[in-house]
Structures are given as C-alpha cells and as structure tokens.
Swiss-Prot record:
PROSITE patterns: RIBOSOMAL_L19. One of its GO terms (cellular component) is cytosolic large ribosomal subunit. It comes from the Bacteria. This protein is located at the 30S-50S ribosomal subunit interface and may play a role in the structure and function of the aminoacyl-tRNA binding site. This is Large ribosomal subunit protein bL19. Belongs to the bacterial ribosomal protein bL19 family. Coiled coil: none annotated. One of its GO terms (biological process) is translation. Keywords: Ribonucleoprotein, Ribosomal protein. Pfam families: Ribosomal_L19. The gene is rplS. GO terms for molecular function: structural constituent of ribosome.
C-alpha cells in the first residue's frame, strides 16, 4: 500500500468512528440528517429522498439524493464522510437494475415510482414463524 492510501485509510477510520452508515444503493429511500448552521446556532434538518447514484470510493465517496419538493425535483450530493451529516437512515429498499437512476429526472408521478424490494429470506422466515 502506498503512502497516500495509508493516509486516506487513517483518515477514513478516524471519520468513521461513532458513525453508522447503512448499506444502501441506488433506488433506496434514505433520510439524511444534515447539520445546518444559521447564524450562531446549529440545527439538524432531515432530507428524505431516493438515492439515484453513488460516486467515488474510499474517503471521497458521495451519493446523490433526489426528492420532489413543492412540485420541483431537487437533487443534493452528499459526501458520505462529511462532518455536516449527522446520520443516515435507510427507509426502504428499491428494486432497480441500474447503477445510476438519472432517467428519473424526466419522469413524474407513477412512472417515477420505484418498486420496493421484497427480501425472499424475510418472507419465508415470517411464513415459517406463523405456522
């Protein structure tokens, strides 16, 4: 491992302590709690939407979240290890077959919906427990 990779790994370990980042990908609905500074006080603002892609790797990894706010599509890019992110929560998993969901930009209403992923193991264990 070269020197830059070692330094990045050290910084990544330092930034990741105390944070739990769920395993999510494109199509998943996530809630990102962002620290917003207004004057001299800081508050936490929730931003919920569909993850339409993840970029980069390691310490430079980021993800894009898209939501519809008052009829307008709003996209925001968050670095995963940003100190401005308070927490990331996975709301639901989506069933998609693409790594980047940029086609959602041109869609509205029902055509922009993403089907929820049904985990086969959870349904079979729930059915077995019911019997």
């Amino acid at each position: 491992m070269n020197l830059i990779q070692e330094l990045e790994k050290e910084q990544l370990d330092k930034l990741a302590t105390g944070k739990t980042i769920p395993d999510f990908g494109p199509g998943d609905t996530v809630t990102v709690n962002v620290k917003v500074k207004e004057g001299d006080r800081t508050r936490v603002q929730a931003y919920e939407g569909v993850c339409i892609g993840r970029n980069g790797g390691g310490i430079n990894e980021s993800f894009t979240v898209r939501k519809i706010s008052y009829g307008e599509g709003v996209e925001r890019v968050f670095p995963i290890y940003s100190p401005m992110i308070d927490s990331i929560k996975l709301v639901r998993r989506g069933k998609v077959r693409r790594a980047k969901l940029y086609y959602l930009r041109g869609r509205r209403g029902k055509s922009a919906r993403i089907v929820e992923k049904q985990d086969q193991r959870q349904t079979t264990t729930a059915a077995a427990a019911a019997e």
